[in-house]
Regions:
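N-terminal helix-turn-helix DNA-binding core of bacterial DNA-binding proteins
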Residues: 1-33, 62
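Short, structured loop/turn "capping" segments at alpha-beta junctions
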Residues: 21-23, 52, 128
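Key DNA-contact positions within bacterial/archaeal DNA-binding proteins
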Residues: 36
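Basic amphipathic alpha-helical segments that dock to polyanions
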Residues: 41-46
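Residue cluster at the C-terminal edge of the helix-turn-helix DNA-binding motif
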Residues: 47-50, 78
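Beta-hairpin "wing" of winged helix-turn-helix
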Residues: 49-64
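Non-DNA-binding regulatory cores of transcription-related proteins
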Residues: 64-138
Length: 138
């Protein structure tokens, strides 16, 4: 998994908390990354209808989705987050051995199921929930 999911949640909480438009520079400063990375990730959120952009003096990103109903699953889907992924596969499907030829398929199913479990868990957590946790921590 890359950091896009974390960055997206951080940006959405900032936008929710501020209640106004924020530039990619302002978001990047709070997230501790560069504005180009923010713009790249927020492009996915814009495409999903979660944020909008404005140019000009009051320009920047503005939250358009209701943070109380915007689930982390929706955010994950907007940035194409995969929580469990493995690019390398052991074995060889062309070998005459059940273990060697079957392991990649079994592991792919395992990873897919784990991603589905993560998505189901995240569907119960909203941007407002994260914001509330941040401001009620002791």
């Amino acid at each position: 998994m890359d950091s896009s999911f974390n960055l997206a949640i951080h940006a959405l909480v900032c936008l929710s908390h501020s209640g106004r438009s924020l530039s990619s520079e302002a978001l990047a400063e709070n997230i501790c990354t560069n504005p180009t990375r923010v713009r790249r990730v927020l492009a996915g959120l814009k495409k999903a209808g979660m944020v909008e952009t404005r140019e000009g003096l009051d320009g920047g990103y503005r939250l358009t989705a209701d943070p109380a109903s915007l689930s982390l699953r929706q955010v994950a889907e907007a940035v194409n987050a995969r929580f469990v992924d493995c690019a390398w596969h052991s074995g060889d499907i062309d070998r005459d051995c059940a273990i060697c030829s079957g392991m990649a398929g079994v592991m792919d199913t395992l990873y897919r199921n784990m991603n589905e479990e993560c998505a189901a868990y995240l569907s119960h957590i909203t941007i407002t929930d994260i914001e509330t946790q941040l401001f009620t921590q002791k």
